[in-house]
Amino acid sequence: MVDAKAAGVMFTINPVNGDVSKVVIEGSFGFGEAVVSGNVTPDRYLVDKVTLVIEERVISDKGSEFVYNPKTKEMEYIELPPDQRKVQCLEDREVIEITRLAKKVEAHFGCPQDTEWSISRSLPFPESIFLVQARPESVWGKKKKESVLGKKTGFDLLFEKALTPTKIKV
């Protein structure tokens, strides 16, 4: 198990609009359960997949984190101190490295991915970043792609052109 200082989800496609040139990263302090379950509003980063530029960052007020309690040997939510609630859970270099991993996992599987990641407290950067789950993105990946020809087939367009009268100047 990763001793997570931060964790969350990452999409190799913008899940809001299907933009394949963007990576969306959401995260919070502690283990990813807080993000996946919706118990916290995560920080959100929109990154250009080609330039690795962070185009948008929304730092949320995170009230708690999901952590391992070594005394009880159980996972639990603990309240964050007020001065830490609006602190960014990721450094910019971590956002960029997660984006690099996003590109690799998408290239490996050949389609946009919905992944979960975790950053270890005890390992140095970038060895501290782990992808703990990857699966095909399920919303935009299932949508039927609109043909560049519209609803007509290539044959329909060719046949239409062949039957269209043309004027020939003599």
Predicted regions and their residues:
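Conserved mixed alpha/beta core segments that line enzyme active sites in large multi-domain catalysts
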Residues: 1-170
